[in-house]
Curated annotation (Swiss-Prot):
Residues 275-353 form the PUA domain. GO terms for biological process: L-proline biosynthetic process. Signal peptide: none annotated. The lineage of its organism: Bacteria, Pseudomonadati, Pseudomonadota, Gammaproteobacteria, Enterobacterales. PROSITE patterns: GLUTAMATE_5_KINASE (PS00902), PUA (PS50890). This is Glutamate 5-kinase. It is found in: Cytoplasm.
């Protein structure tokens, strides 16, 4: 349809519960109404929803459970079916079908599984079905979790080939300071590039009860904008917020997409949750950042995590700053063995080699 857009709407726990311990159904009804209205106008809508644990706790009558991962997964297992049932019931009022997609990091860090997820998303949207996405909290451990639904929504936006990503929160947008304790705080209306100054402003400011504060929203915005997707952070309570974003009206904080977005494979590299990380010395930083070189084993100081060859890893400098994401040419065990050694020693150390570089420049995205 001419002029139709694909919009990903992310609803965090603070929006879905209104700050309480239970789902705020009246608020969810209103947001579904807004989304259904845009769906009827020909736009494609994707929902990224939190709230499975809150729904499970409510359904079980707020049981007293130990604060363990197993307890959270129990609540998520009970609540996820209740949550998707709620979305299904509300969208059915408007004759709209929904399709559930539960994802973990493993689905997104592997290129083939990423493409399969993208194909599923495309099929749902092509058939006018609203994908409802959540992290698979019932089975996800710390090692396989994306970690928060802000970053999950950025990945969903890439999967959907979205035009815009709307991050709904309990704040009006990103402020120059925390508006709850600083009366001088001003709303930042437009952002044309995310830099260290903006990251410092976001800091550890929180946006309610969920796992994602403004810092994670900024991370999500960075990923989506690099993929050519506009991002808006706005209050879920603002009347007509979904239509405002579709129509391009001023609302919340708008992050403008890069004019020259990353090509598809590099969107995956930058967006995929890193399976591990490596720390590199100053010489490697100079070679990568100033000369555009590949990362050689000689420059690696430390390897963290367990990852396979072909998985995306994070590259940091000695002070811990995030420099780049890249596809590892070697698994983590091999990387530890060849770290600090010259490339010509790889075959002797491992008994095999996949080339002289640890991460090739073509498989790397500088942060």
């Amino acid at each position: 349809m001419n002029g139709s857009q694909t919009l990903v709407v992310k609803l965090g726990t603070s929006v879905l519960t209104g700050g309480s311990l239970r789902l705020n159904r009246a608020h969810i009804v209103e947001l579904v109404r807004q989304c259904a209205q845009q769906h009827a106008a020909g736009h494609r809508i994707v929902i990224v929803t939190s709230g499975a644990i809150a729904a499970g706790r409510e359904h079980l009558g707020y049981p007293e459970l130990p604060a363990t991962i197993a307890s959270k997964q129990l609540l998520a297992a009970v609540g996820q079916s209740r949550l998707i049932q709620l979305w299904e019931q509300l969208f059915s009022i408007y004759g709209i079908h929904v399709g559930q997609m539960l994802l973990t990091r493993a689905d997104l860090e592997d290129r083939e599984r990423f493409l399969n997820a993208r194909d599923t998303m495309t099929a749902l949207l092509d058939n006018r079905i609203v994908p409802v996405i959540n992290e698979n909290d019932a089975v996800a451990t710390a090692e396989i979790k994306v970690g928060d639904n802000d970053n999950l929504s950025a990945l969903a936006a890439i999967l959907a080939g979205a035009d815009k990503l709307l991050l709904l929160t309990d704040q009006q947008g990103l402020y120059t300071a925390d508006p709850r304790n600083n009366p001088q705080a001003e709303l930042i209306r437009e952002v044309h590039g995310i830099d260290d100054a903006l990251r410092a402003i976001a800091g550890d400011s929180v946006s309610g009860l969920g796992t994602g504060g403004m810092g994670t929203k900024l991370q999500a915005a960075d990923v989506a904008c690099r993929a050519g997707i506009d991002v808006v952070i706005a209050a879920g309570s603002k009347p007509g917020v979904v239509a405002d974003v579709i129509e391009g009206k001023p609302v919340g904080t708008r992050f403008h997409a890069l004019e020259t977005p990353l090509e598809n494979r590099k969107r995956w590299i930058f967006g995929a949750p890193p399976a591990g990380e490596i720390t590199v010395d100053d010489g490697a930083v100079e070679a990568m950042m100033a000369r555009g070189s590949s990362l050689l084993p000689k420059g690696i100081r430390e390897v963290k995590g367990d990852f396979s060859r072909g998985e995306v890893i994070r590259i940091r400098n000695l002070t811990g700053r995030d420099l780049a994401h890249g596809v590892s040419r070697y698994n983590s065990d091999a990387m530890r063995m060849i770290a600090g050694h010259h490339s010509q020693e790889i075959s002797e150390i491992l008994g095999y080699e996949y080339g002289p570089v640890a991460v090739h420049r073509d498989d790397m995205i500088v942060s």
